[in-house]
């Protein structure tokens, strides 16, 4: 019995860190890889690659923990999140705080093996990750903060590889923010009715009936910025083909979300992991 209880507790911690749902890690991983390859004009050093890949999974897990801690009094009132470990009581608030600190320390320990610029940037990134979960209390624009928090791996990657933050770095960062706001608005559309009842704010609520139009504009802006980025860095035809592929996926997502049904919006959100992968393949073969 004791062994089964222990196993159940570990499973609850895994669910709290979303180990069973890697979509968030993938949406963070792909642009990190774009930046690592573009910053150095090719494959980064193996250790640098390891630090960033491990850091993606550690910080995404930490972000999920602090997000659920911040939302612990709201999640129980939302159908999709009521069974999460904190609102269901499977994991205590104190345990969640300890887990968050452990994950952050592990990630920071890896960053300490990189250069000074990257270390300082990581401190700013932690601040963004901490602020994001609480933004939905005070603003309808938490998705923009999420984009900055998730996208902060881009300047960190440039700093780690080239010890510089050129214009191309910030162009990619801005493109990623546009993409994040687009896909996280799709995600927020799933919970929009529940969020309205409990007073949680989001871009899905702010955009209202113009949600799909604004998502489309954000997706177009992302592709336009990445197109300019490609010309600035001299990327080859495979990269531009990958942008067309991603654009096709965005059109598919628009078709999915046209009826604003929960399952369709969630499916559209998940489709973004393939768009990110397609662009990385384009970067890989376009260099």
Swiss-Prot record:
The kind of enzyme this is, by top-level EC class, is transferase
User: What does it do?
Assistant: Catalyzes the prenylation of para-hydroxybenzoate (PHB) with an all-trans polyprenyl group. Mediates the second step in the final reaction sequence of ubiquinone-8 (UQ-8) biosynthesis, which is the condensation of the polyisoprenoid side chain with PHB, generating the first membrane-bound Q intermediate 3-octaprenyl-4-hydroxybenzoate.
The entry assigns this protein to a family as follows: Belongs to the UbiA prenyltransferase family.
Q: What Gene Ontology cellular-component terms does the record carry?
A: plasma membrane
Name of the protein: 4-hydroxybenzoate octaprenyltransferase
Q: Which CDD domains match?
A: PT_UbiA_COQ2
Catalytic activity, per the record?
Answer: all-trans-octaprenyl diphosphate + 4-hydroxybenzoate = 4-hydroxy-3-(all-trans-octaprenyl)benzoate + diphosphate
Report TM segments: 23-40, 99-119, 141-161, 163-183, 213-233, 235-255, 266-286
